[in-house]
Amino acid sequence: MAKKVAAQIKLQLPAGKATPAPPVGPALGQHGVNIMEFCKRFNAETADKAGMILPVVITVYEDKSFTFIIKTPPASFLLKKAAGIESGSSEPKRKIVGKVTRKQIEEIAKIKMPDLNANDLEAAMRIIEGTARSMGIEVVD
């Protein structure tokens, strides 16, 4: 018999640095999950990806046990890293804050492929290019 799902929690956490402080503590605490156990397991699994922000989907079951799936870093995070900028443009399409090459877009698309709703690399690249444009990052050849 499969366990009954009580809740699904989505968080974006720095790799290897989950702590019981907000936002982790309150999000998991209200569902009765052992917060320290989650933090230890998450940090152990993401220790090799230091410096990245990773989305995680935590499934909490009725018996207070949990499982979690770690997704690929957000496209915006990868684009900011590739362009070497702190944050996106305050006025996208008017104010360009950085540049990325097609090669960098392809690399990001390859990393994001498992989480994107795209059939091939071309479609994935177009999705990432759109994200770049909406952040005020210019795509150059």
Swiss-Prot record:
PANTHER family referenced in this protein's UniProt entry, alphabetically: 60S RIBOSOMAL PROTEIN L12, LARGE RIBOSOMAL SUBUNIT PROTEIN UL11M
Function according to Swiss-Prot or TrEMBL: Forms part of the ribosomal stalk which helps the ribosome interact with GTP-bound translation factors.
Subunit comment: Part of the ribosomal stalk of the 50S ribosomal subunit. Interacts with L10 and the large rRNA to form the base of the stalk. L10 forms an elongated spine to which L12 dimers bind in a sequential fashion forming a multimeric L10(L12)X complex.
SMART domains: RL11
GO biological process: translation
Gene name of the encoded protein: rplK
Protein modification: One or more lysine residues are methylated.
Pfam families on file: Ribosomal_L11 (PF00298), Ribosomal_L11_N (PF03946)
Family assignment from sequence similarity: Belongs to the universal ribosomal protein uL11 family.
CDD domains the record matches: Ribosomal_L11
Protein name, as recorded: Large ribosomal subunit protein uL11
Organism expressing this protein natively: Thermotoga neapolitana (strain ATCC 49049 / DSM 4359 / NBRC 107923 / NS-E)
UniProt KW keywords: Methylation, Ribonucleoprotein, Ribosomal protein, RNA-binding, rRNA-binding
Keyword Ribonucleoprotein: yes
Lineage of the species this protein comes from: Bacteria, Thermotogati, Thermotogota, Thermotogae, Thermotogales
GO MF entries: large ribosomal subunit rRNA binding; structural constituent of ribosome
